[in-house]
């Protein structure tokens, strides 16, 4: 799985007025571009090329070049040329703008003033947007993928000062060298960053002429310092301190390249948060995210929708739960909440041993509403979706645990759980032969504190649940029975496809990789195995066959099928000779 990162080189601000196009501002002062060298490595190496090199401890200058930016040039281009190129005609405005030049992608959504001289379409509103809270909601949840079709009404600035600016364009310059990640990266940047930012700027321009005034202010500052022969790097670094719009763009850039949330205040009117969505799960240990952020879970099991797989959209199922990454009080302070709101009630009631179904029942809401609240917290990296933490499950020391932090983490652990043994002691216990977590709990009175301790260890990436995955094992005797059955049945005997599959099989013991898409011969094997333990057990076995593909954890199968845990255990015991089990995270 390739990790998507912004691959952001710079952010430009361009405007077009009655006197022509102007290159107004860019950040950073000296953009750097990663050279797109030719690589002959395997796929995993190629995937790494498409990542922002946050994990490069040694900054290889040979792999970077920097075209010195000054008053008139940036990235080796004349700013006047860029201003004209990035100021398209009106037919291409108010929609996605994407140009690829010399390995760089220029992405944005140019906003053009309407034929009537208005920046926003007027619609009859139910309520007029005036307050900060409404503005924030407006920006964070645009109704379409293009800012041009927003349904908000604004009171335009005075008609006496009709805008001389006809277009403004915030351009995100990307460097995405590999084709495999190009389209997902560009689409993610546009949908999650560009649209939301431009919607907010368009709103303020329509309401208060904000963007035009800021452009005038920035250009005046630039002209003033330039005429005084102040070095470009000196005066350009000061512009964000004197311009709110420049500060917004600089903050956005710095947050994105560091994978942080950009908390923006546009014109002291709109509070907007921008966040690059991250993958919520990985099935490989070679994933850098596991070391830098706890909101990625390590999972071999299928945790995404089979119909709509996604590495970004979190999978939530009724039998899963939510693990908060901070304590409840901390999240309550950081997430803007209305007192007694549904989200605050949801956060207060969430426990890692309660399934989403349990939480929904306690709140008196539907499971789908519960999912919406959970996905909101997951998106903002306040929580992760996991199978419920249960003492009868097996937990082991995480293969990605950062032992360099053990001393510091041990102090935090002791402060959090003063009555328990040390963190090192628990990690040592969990590193031995895997066993149910309940076996290390001294008494029933200790269950609650041990569950809290387990949640603490999970959210800090010290332990993972050890899961059991299964395949159907087909012994030679089953294959012999299948041959006899086929030979005795006239229709099967004359089935050319079945005969061909039979000829290709060597008759030795094998496994069925995916029962859901089993061949005709494999279906025969499954049918014979099912009835090996009698007609009463056969339907029970066939009900779980689709999960025996090595991707679904045993701990979730019985919940997904609504089978009692004891019955599930009986099924597996009965068919033990025909099931291959393996343990993983």
From Swiss-Prot:
Polar residues bias (residue ranges): 128-138
Signal peptide residues on this chain, from the entry's feature table: none
Cellular component terms (Gene Ontology): cytosol; GATOR1 complex; vacuolar membrane
Pfam families in UniProt: HTH_NPRL3, NPR3
InterPro entries, per the entry: HTH_NPRL3, Npr3
Entry's Gene Ontology BP terms: cellular response to amino acid starvation; negative regulation of TORC1 signaling; positive regulation of autophagy
Region (Disordered): 117-157
Bias-annotated ranges (Low complexity): 148-157
Similarity-based family: Belongs to the NPR3 family.
Protein name (database record): Nitrogen permease regulator 3-like protein
Source species of the chain: Schizosaccharomyces pombe (strain 972 / ATCC 24843)
Taxon lineage: Eukaryota, Fungi, Dikarya, Ascomycota, Taphrinomycotina
């Amino acid at each position: 799985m390739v990790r998507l990162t912004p691959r952001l080189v710079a952010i430009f601000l361009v405007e077009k007025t009655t006197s022509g196009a102007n290159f107004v501002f860019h950040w950073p002062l000296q953009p750097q571009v990663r050279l797109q060298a030719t690589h002959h490595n395997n796929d995993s190496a190629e995937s790494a090329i498409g990542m922002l090199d946050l994990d490069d401890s040694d900054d290889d200058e040979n792999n970077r070049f920097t075209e010195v930016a000054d008053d008139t040039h940036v990235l080796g281009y004349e700013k006047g040329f860029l201003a004209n190129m990035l100021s398209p005609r009106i037919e291409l405005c108010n929609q996605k703008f994407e140009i690829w030049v010399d390995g760089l992608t220029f992405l944005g959504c140019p906003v053009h003033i309407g034929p009537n001289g208005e920046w926003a379409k007027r619609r009859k509103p139910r309520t007029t947007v005036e307050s900060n809270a409404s503005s924030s909601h407006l920006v964070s949840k645009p109704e379409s993928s293009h800012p041009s079709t927003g349904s908000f009404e604004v009171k335009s600035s005075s008609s006496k000062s009709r805008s001389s600016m006809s277009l403004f364009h915030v351009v995100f310059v990307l460097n995405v060298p590999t084709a495999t990640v190009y389209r997902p990266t560009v689409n993610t940047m546009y949908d999650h960053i560009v649209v939301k930012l431009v919607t907010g700027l368009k709103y303020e321009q329509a309401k208060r002429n904000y963007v035009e005034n800021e452009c005038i202010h920035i250009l005046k500052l630039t002209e003033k310092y330039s005429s005084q022969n102040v070095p470009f790097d000196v005066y350009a670094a000061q512009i964000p301190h004197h311009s709110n719009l420049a500060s917004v763009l600089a903050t956005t850039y710095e947050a994105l390249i560091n994978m942080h949330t950009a908390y923006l205040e546009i014109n002291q009117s709109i509070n907007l948060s921008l966040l690059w969505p991250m993958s919520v799960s990985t099935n490989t240990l070679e994933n850098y995210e596991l070391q830098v952020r706890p909101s990625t879970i390590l999972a071999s099991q299928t945790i995404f929708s089979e119909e709509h797989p996604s590495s970004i959209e979190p999978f939530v199922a009724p039998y899963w739960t939510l693990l908060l990454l901070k304590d409840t009080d901390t999240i309550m302070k950081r997430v803007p909440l209305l007192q007694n709101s549904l989200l605050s009630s949801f956060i207060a009631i969430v426990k890692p041993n309660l399934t989403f179904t349990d939480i929904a029942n306690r709140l008196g809401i539907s499971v789908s509403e519960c999912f919406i609240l959970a996905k909101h917290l997951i998106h903002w990296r306040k929580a992760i979706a996991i199978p419920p933490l249960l003492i009868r499950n097996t937990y082991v020391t995480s293969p990605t645990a950062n032992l360099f932090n053990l001393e510091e983490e041990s102090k935090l652990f002791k402060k959090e759980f003063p009555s328990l043994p040390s963190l090192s002691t628990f990690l040592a216990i969990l590193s031995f032969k895997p066993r149910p977590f309940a076996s290390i709990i001294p008494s029933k009175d200790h269950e609650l504190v041990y569950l809290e301790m387990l949640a603490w260890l999970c959210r800090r990436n010290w332990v993972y649940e050890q899961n059991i995955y299964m395949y159907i094992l087909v012994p030679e005797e089953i294959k012999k029975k299948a041959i006899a059955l086929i030979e005795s049945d006239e229709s099967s005997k004359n089935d050319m496809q079945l005969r061909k599959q039979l000829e290709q099989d060597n008759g030795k013991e094998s496994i069925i990789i995916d029962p859901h898409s089993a061949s005709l011969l494999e279906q025969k094997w499954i049918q014979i195995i099912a009835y090996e333990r009698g007609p009463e057990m056969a339907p029970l076995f066939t009900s779980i066959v689709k999960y025996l593909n090595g991707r679904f954890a045993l701990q979730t199968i019985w919940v997904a099928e609504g089978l009692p845990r004891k019955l599930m255990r009986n099924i597996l015991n009965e068919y033990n000779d025909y099931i291959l089990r393996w343990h993983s995270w």
